[in-house]
Amino acid sequence: MSKKPYRIAVIPGDGIGKEVMPEGIRVIEAAAKKHGVAVQFDHFDFSSYDYYEKHGQMMPDDWKTQIGSHDAIYFGAVGWPAKIADHVSLWGSLIKFRREFDQYVNLRPVRLMPGVPCPLANRKPGDIDFWVVRENTEGEYSSVGGRMFPDTDREFVTQQTVMTRTGVDRILKFAFELAQSRPKKHLTSATKSNGISITMPYWDERVEAMARNYPGVKWDKYHIDILTANFVLHPDWFDVVVGSNLFGDILSDLGPACTGTIGIAPSGNINPERNFPSVFEPVHGSAPDIAGQGIANPIGMIWSGAMMLEHLGEKTAAQSIVGAIERTLAERTLRTRDLGGNADTEACGKAVAEMVD
């Protein structure tokens, strides 16, 4: 066993987050037991509509005190649009985590798994395997801007992109380091400097400057419009793709869609220096339309758990989970309905746990 247990803050959140979270924990516990990793799960009920309904806010005032000393945050999903506006639930929880815990890296794998039908022609497992690195705390999603003269002919709105040298350089450093660690050693930058004439040329300048520190990494850049086309036409070209907050947001959803489904995609909102806990969550969201039916696919939650273990330094345990996911997806009867199987959420989660080696 590790010297002391990793303390994980568990926040199921809304909708199917509450259903897939137990399966994620089940698989982590299976991997932890086999690989001598000690894990302690602490459960929290905030960052959910249920909490908002009772307290009028998404999280308690002392939320940072409650979870700030944990090693990581394992997050299910947030949002219930029929009951609470998305901007209220998101900005009242996940955005706070990202900004106040300085989770400046959003990291998502794009990988075609066995048993998952690919919408792209003539693609098989192994053909699509890359990472999208998204700047997560500034860029186009700043709060700088405003609205004036509402409901008049003079009405206008503005929202400014914010790029700082510190912010741009640190995300590029993370991306180049990741590319350097991979066999292909190839980085692609998303830009639009032919149309966005101030911030994007600056981004390009910083990419070129950072590249000089990594002579062993090949790099290129594409404008975001053609880059999205190449994700579909030539996904095998890519290894590590880095983009600003907006461009990274677009690409990190498009990439998993090219592998057949975003329903199994994981993600990490990461503070690489570990000054604060990082958040690991599935991409799929709260899915109110299927919540409560026990049919949600738990793979995204489970895969996010593997990313969390790798972030904590438990690479062998993490790899054992990813391998178990691959073996489970290869068996049609063990897949959930969205992937053509007939397993429910619990059965799929148990299958992955049993296949952990």
Identify the function of each model-found stretch:
Residues 9-26, 31-32, 152-224, 237:
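Glycine-rich phosphate/diphosphate-binding loop of Rossmann-like nucleotide-binding domains
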Residues 14-17, 71, 133, 175, ...:
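Buried hydrophobic positions in well-ordered alpha/beta secondary-structure cores of metabolic enzymes
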Residues 24, 28, 207, 301-309, ...:
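Buried hydrophobic packing segments
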Residues 36-60, 231:
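N-terminal beta-loop-helix "entrance" segment that forms/cooperates
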Residues 51-158, 246:
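N-terminal glycine-rich phosphate/adenylate-binding segment common to multiple enzyme folds
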Residues 52, 230-333:
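Glycine-rich phosphate/nucleotide-binding loop
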Residues 115, 222-229:
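Short acidic loop-to-helix transition motifs that present clustered carboxylates
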Residues 137, 143-189, 193-196, 315, ...:
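Glycine-rich phosphate/pyrophosphate-binding loop and the adjoining helix
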